[in-house]
């Protein structure tokens, strides 16, 4: 569960390393889970890349420590909170995605991120 002021790792090679959530997009929810889009600020970035500290970006949540419950009763949890930086159209800014990605992103039509992922759980 991600809320404003939550810190997230970046799970792609866009150039940002750490994000801080400043807004959860979508009707009235103050917390985000896997597949939700957030507005975030870059807190740490790799030098000489597209992002620098204090840039405002859109990102989609791909992993949370809280996890999600599936219809078959299984709960999927991850070791960290992570997001992938996206553009206005919903396409990832990076060309690679690191770590496992939850299958629930397919429900939000984020199949481009799933196709870049090394492992879909």
Swiss-Prot record:
Disulfide bond positions: none
Keywords in alphabetical order: Chloroplast, Plastid, Ribonucleoprotein, Ribosomal protein, RNA-binding, rRNA-binding
GO cellular component: chloroplast; cytosolic large ribosomal subunit
Compartment(s): Plastid, Chloroplast
Record-level Gene Ontology MF annotations: large ribosomal subunit rRNA binding; structural constituent of ribosome
GO biological process: translation
UniProt-listed CDD domains: Ribosomal_uL14 (cd00337)
Similarity remark: Belongs to the universal ribosomal protein uL14 family.
Family annotation (PANTHER family): 50S/60S RIBOSOMAL PROTEIN L14/L23, LARGE RIBOSOMAL SUBUNIT PROTEIN UL14M
Function, as annotated: Binds to 23S rRNA.
Assembly with partners or alone: Part of the 50S ribosomal subunit.
Name of this protein: Large ribosomal subunit protein uL14c
Gene source species: Oedogonium cardiacum (Filamentous green alga)
Gene: rpl14
């Amino acid at each position: 569960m991600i809320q404003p002021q939550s810190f997230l790792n970046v799970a792609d090679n866009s150039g940002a390393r750490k994000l801080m959530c400043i807004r959860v997009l979508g009707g009235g929810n103050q917390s985000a889970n896997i597949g939700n889009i957030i507005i975030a600020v870059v807190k740490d970035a790799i030098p000489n890349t597209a992002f620098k500290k204090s840039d405002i970006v859109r990102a989609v949540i791909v992993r949370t420590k809280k996890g999600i419950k599936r219809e078959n009763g299984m709960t999927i949890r991850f070791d960290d909170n992570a997001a992938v930086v996206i553009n206005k159209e919903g396409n990832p800014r990076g060309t690679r995605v690191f770590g496992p990605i939850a299958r629930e992103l397919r429900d939000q039509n984020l199949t481009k991120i799933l196709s870049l992922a090394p492992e879909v759980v």
